[in-house]
């Protein structure tokens, strides 16, 4: 696989601390398992899954990934989380786990590290990915600077898609 990476540092988008909780502080119906995971039940009629983003944002993100993948005949994927010390190497490693890594584009974003990486497989090279990658990073960082994480992800995917020719 041949990969290309583009990186642009932006201001922090999100941050947080790891929290610990005592058993007595847990709400009723919640337990601390032996593995350290917190597990709980929900009240009847209440959602049992709490997504990190509003459902409308998740739908918009899914639509951007779906339509971009169809338009370019390339699998688009997003990774959101820590990328470690070598962000480009970690992004390439994550791309390798995508079902079709040779024909995929990964947008990897580490908000706490202020890092954005775009890597792609060998079948995408030569189809415009080289020039689309820095434009996608710029589109993402512009929205991230405004505190708009999901909009930045969607903008980057759309820009990448517009710059990559179908295979």
From Swiss-Prot:
Domain of life the protein comes from: Bacteria
Name of the featured protein: Uncharacterized protein Rv2468c
Disulphide linkage map: none
Organism this protein belongs to: Mycobacterium tuberculosis (strain ATCC 25618 / H37Rv)
Residue ranges of the TM segments: none
GO cellular component: plasma membrane
Pfam families registered for this protein in UniProt: DUF5130
């Amino acid at each position: 696989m041949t990969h290309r990476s583009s990186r642009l540092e932006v201001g922090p988008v999100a941050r947080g601390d790891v929290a610990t909780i005592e058993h007595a502080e847990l709400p009723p119906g919640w337990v601390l398992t032996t593995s350290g995971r917190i597990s709980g039940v929900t009240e009847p009629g209440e959602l049992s899954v709490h997504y990190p983003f509003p459902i409308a944002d998740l739908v918009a993100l899914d639509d951007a990934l779906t339509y971009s993948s169809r338009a370019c005949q390339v699998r688009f994927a997003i990774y959101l989380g820590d990328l470690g010390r070598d962000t480009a190497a970690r992004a390439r490693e994550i791309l390798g786990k995508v079902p079709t890594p040779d024909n995929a584009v990964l947008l990897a974003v580490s908000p706490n590290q202020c890092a954005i990486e775009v890597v792609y497989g060998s079948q995408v090279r030569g189809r415009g990915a080289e020039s689309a990658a820095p434009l996608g990073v710029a589109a993402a960082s512009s929205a991230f600077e405004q505190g708009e994480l999901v909009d930045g992800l969607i903008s980057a995917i759309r820009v990448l898609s517009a710059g990559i020719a179908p295979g």
